[in-house]
Curated annotation (Swiss-Prot):
Cofactor-binding details, from the entry: Binds 1 zinc ion per subunit.
Protein name from the UniProt record: Succinylglutamate desuccinylase
GO biological process: arginine catabolic process to glutamate; arginine catabolic process to succinate
Family designation: Belongs to the AspA/AstE family. Succinylglutamate desuccinylase subfamily.
Organism: Photorhabdus laumondii subsp. laumondii (strain DSM 15139 / CIP 105565 / TT01)
Amino acid sequence: MDLLTLLLEKKLADHLTFPETINAHWLAEGVLQLIPHEEGNRSLVISAGIHGNETAPIEILIQLLAQLAEGTLALKNNVLIIFGNLPAMRTNRRYLHDDLNRMFGGRYLNFPLGNERSRAAELENVVNRFFAEPSVSSTNIRWHIDLHTAIRASHHEQFALLPAQNRPFSAEFMQWLHDSDIDALVYHREKAGTFSHFLSEKFGADSCTMEMGKAMPFGENDLTRFQKITDALYGLISLSQITARIKFELKHYQVINSIIKSHDSFQLHIPADTLNFTELPEGFEIASQHDHHWKIKFPAKFILFPNAEVANGLRAGLLLALNKK
């Protein structure tokens, strides 16, 4: 039985074994702590499936675990592997009750009881336990890569969102993002309930939400499209050299405004197939509800994650400015 099937059938912990050079410990269902016997100087959290129907990152992490188990990939750093929303994965849904990636930093307490509220509390707990591990707490380099795929297609297929923080991101982290061959970086400037923001704020990790392409069902992903990102992840874990950037220049965007849906009358005035990072004309009314209208105003001319179907109180889109770098 393949590892993905074992994960979905709640059997992975009983069947997955590793070489003696790796100390493996399951902290919760779908949460695996891996510590090398030879102490590393970096601690990594790599997560996928925070949204259950974003399958390509889950398949990539399964492949990574298979190579570690076979001994074909060496473990040189402390790693916490997280498969986020397992019940949603099993039903090919984004979430069962509420969006898990809006709940971190204790925000889950503001949501009704349900699958995601319980999982957010559990994931916060296991990350605390990981960073309290003596071999982990002694490291001064902490990174978090939260792997996602997007609901819609994009002008920039692969990009990363960086959480708002008062300290600069390390040069090494930014170079790794550059060399992973993503197309764009998006900088948040407000706090959020995302997993990446939680790791940044609570543990001082260099953290990002990495969008790898359009969401597809299990088994329908062409994983060769993500090979450079996969190689970059393997390089992090094994301390192997990754190849330099191949693509054109990395673009940088700043989040200027969030479109927050607060009423059932909310509408987006763009076609359903509008691509992420579409540039819109000055003065265009992109969204409205009974008491508010959102119009495009320079420099925030690019739309990201437009979604009129979100629940009231949640973000229905981001308006971005392109930084000239």
